[in-house]
Amino acid sequence: MNKEELLKKYEATSNEKAKDVFFSPGRINVIGEHTDYNGGHVFPAPISLGVYGVYGPRDDKKVRLYSGNVDGDIVEFDIDDTNVEKDEDRFWANYFKGMITYLREKYDGIDHGFNLYIEANLPSGSGLSSSAAIEMLMGIILKDEFNLDVDRVSLAKMGQRTENEFIGLNSGIMDQFACIMGKKNSAIFLDCNTLKYEYLPLALGDYEIIIMATNNPHTLADSAYNNRVAECGRALKKLQQKLDIKALGELDNDTFDEYSYLINDETEIKRARHAVSENQRTLRATQAMKDGDLEKLGRLINASHESLHYDYEVTGKELDTLAEASWKQPGVLGARMIGGGFGGSAIAIVKKSEAENFKKNVGKIYRDAVGYDASFYDAEIVDGTKRI
């Protein structure tokens, strides 16, 4: 997206010059799905699809948000206003309001409002973490404008708090961490229990990652996402009768199998089994990445999707169609759904020489199966949220 064009759009909506332009990336997750809130490991990376913000300070306390993706969509509120926006047309402002609220709780000096023109090139409802991108965009803008002594990990935690407490979605920290801590051409191997992390180059050689958007938007807060969190929580509590653990991510597969009888509920056993096995797959996958064993990485990615389908039950027809069609194509190492599920997106690791045929073939299979088109994007891995 052209910076000069963004500046012109800001001036057209605010009748003044902008101060700065910022970009906050969306993210993919190579493997480690629904493990972050279970104290497990994840392996995400920020992508070139994301959210742009053109910023200008005001001399009053008004915050004026203008969305370039919905023509004329403007939300205004006072910087002291900490009320959750209930109106569906204004709900997107909550991601900004939550960050403003929690930063002002901890840091003095955020004493004036601002104008912000926002435009995203993320596919709508794609599950590529536009909400976390917005939260981290707001965090970095406020840190920059008011010279706040806040580190990026703390901003990621505030973004998670915005989701959990302000929005009401019981998500983990992976999305915010990936958006703000990203490093070009690398994925982040993150322990969500300790927040220890390691950058691993996404060295795929003759292969690339292709993002496949179902174009069936997911709405996590209105879906079964919170139910999955609760089911895992109940399973953990039952396991704690015999095991000294704080999270499902502390278990290996054998220990879980030995003590799963304590759960005594088939659905909760399935949910917990995914959380445990997916964490183990993530550990093995990152080791395969270090070893340069891309075929093993691909097999683990496929197994991740199967677990998300059978044990976690968050895939659905669209995501299953994309994954299963991908598995049948030449030059594909692995494919799986990413994000919360219930729509959204999938990824595939595809040989570069087969990429165009892959998109054509999978696209046709998908359209024939569901009745509308999927969208395909090459995943370019970029730095985390920053001024541009």
UniProtKB/Swiss-Prot annotation:
Biological pathway: Carbohydrate metabolism; galactose metabolism
Predominant localisation class: cytoplasm
EC number: 2.7.1.6
Residues reported to bind ATP: S67, G125, S126, G127, L128, S129, S130, S131
Keyword Chaperone: no
Site (Transition state stabilizer): R27
Catalytic center residues: D175 (proton acceptor)
Binding positions for Mg(2+) per the UniProt entry: S131, E163
Compartment(s) where it occurs, according to its Swiss-Prot or TrEMBL record: Cytoplasm
PROSITE patterns: GALACTOKINASE (PS00106), GHMP_KINASES_ATP (PS00627)
Keywords: ATP-binding, Carbohydrate metabolism, Cytoplasm, Galactose metabolism, Kinase, Magnesium, Metal-binding, Nucleotide-binding, Transferase
Catalytic activity as recorded in UniProt: alpha-D-galactose + ATP = alpha-D-galactose 1-phosphate + ADP + H(+)
Residues reported in the UniProt entry to bind substrate: E33, H34, T35, D36, Y225
A GO cellular component entry from the record: cytosol
One GO process term, biological-process aspect: galactose metabolic process
GO MF annotations in UniProt: ATP binding; galactokinase activity; magnesium ion binding
Gene3D superfamilies: 3.30.230.10, GHMP kinase, C-terminal domain
UniProt family annotation: Belongs to the GHMP kinase family. GalK subfamily.
Free-text function comment from the UniProt entry: Catalyzes the transfer of the gamma-phosphate of ATP to D-galactose to form alpha-D-galactose-1-phosphate (Gal-1-P).
PANTHER family: GALACTOKINASE-RELATED, MEVALONATE KINASE/GALACTOKINASE
Protein name per the record: Galactokinase
Gene label: galK
